[in-house]
Amino acid sequence: MKEQTASRMSAALFEYTAKPPVGEIIPLGLQHVVAAIVGVVTPAILVANICELGAADKTILVQVSLVVSALATLLQLYKIGPIGSSLPVIIGISFAYVPTLLSIGGQFGIATILGAQITGGIAAFVVGLFVKQLRALFPSVVTGTVIFTIGLSLYPTAVRYMAGGAGSDSFGSWQNWLVALITFGVVVFCNYFTKGFTKLASILLGMVVGYVLALAMGMVSFDSARDANWFQLIMPLHFGIKFEISAIISMVIMFVVNAVQAIGDFSSTTLGGMDRQPTDKELSGGIMASGIVSVVSAFFGGLPTATYSQNVGIVTVNRVVNRLVFAFAALVLLVAGFIPKFAAVLTTIPQCVIGGATISVFAMITMTGIRMITSEPLTPRNTAVVGLAVALGVGVTSVQGSLGGFPVWVGTVFGSSSVVIATLVAILLNLILPRNKTEA
């Protein structure tokens, strides 16, 4: 396949450090921007809404998300000492953290999210140092269970947004559902009935159609965009930083799990684009870089990042691994991050449009978890690990007040996010349940 693709593009595109023509770098880089842009800004909008941030602060949070994603990508491409993977990846704000971010943000606010993120980033850095030793705790059955639970926990968020967003005066109206379902329909059509650019940009195109429809129905206000500046530097500690032990525990658990999960994304990149497994040095450097970025970005309001699987998929298909292509994509995101007017326009997207577009993303997260789970035989032991972890994780958090007799911090850590309970139960059961001879 590589030879066929190379016949249409210069050979330099398939070498990491080569210098292909600018005319080839730009369209391939923009392809990665299109694939990543929705994932970069949507978590920031979700967090801004749950934290009840004003229009100006919401714009800043989106700005920072763009800048952090760009800088995190550049650090992976151009490593500093042992920090960075030197692999062709795009890094962006991660949906995997969203359930925990919404839980912490709804209870404590944005400053506590950022404080917990600092400790989580430190934990991820430590995981990077000892990645070989810690991998044994996270086989596919455990990691798959965690990802599956993340997807499940995000469905209520998507449905609330499809209905118009909690607290909205028009919550549940037919107008919200009409826009949401049309957005959803366009995403599905583009993803499964088209090829090339429209398939790649299915979520973006769905949001564009939904946005235009919402605009025609008078559901969009440009007040925040009208007042936004054309250029603005990002100032540190704008949102402040607070430390809350229960939030820290939840975030550290999520950072450790996602640090180990990053191994899969790095492996997919090297296998799909370079026909090899990643080295231990690449894995360690990549995870440590993610940890450092999370710590530093927290001081500016940036949210946790991860490797984008959709961009890994592009690498697997076209096998273009030249870092200048990815650096160009990062620079586009970086420039966009310093233009508040652009970020402000993104914040005007109605919640029903976001819900209609993201429910398919959350479904894909869930199915990724199922694929990981089924990559190992579904023995009675493995089904017990998955079933019991999901049952306790989803069950406890679905019953309000189920931990009401415990100290407040217990309810905050274990009663607000199904992912935390599912993660701990899956790890514990995987360690203590006996294996038969075929599983040993």
Positions of predicted regions on the chain:
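Intrinsically disordered, low-complexity non-transmembrane regions of multi-pass membrane transporters
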Residues: 1-28, 222-235, 271-278, 286, ...
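N-terminal signal-anchor module of multipass membrane proteins
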Residues: 1-89, 96-104
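Juxtamembrane interface elements at the cytosolic ends of transmembrane helices
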Residues: 2-10, 40-44, 48, 183-193, ...
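Membrane-embedded helical hairpins/re-entrant loop segments and their flanking transmembrane helices
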Residues: 22, 48-84, 252-323
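Hydrophobic, membrane-embedded alpha-helices of multi-pass small-molecule transporters
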Residues: 23-36, 172-184, 202, 217, ...
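Generic transmembrane alpha-helix signature in multi-pass membrane proteins
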Residues: 44-48, 98-106, 132, 156-163, ...
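Short, non-helical or kinked segments that cap or interrupt transmembrane helices
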Residues: 60-61, 82-95, 136-145, 199-205, ...
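Membrane-embedded alpha-helical modules
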Residues: 104-223, 330, 335-440
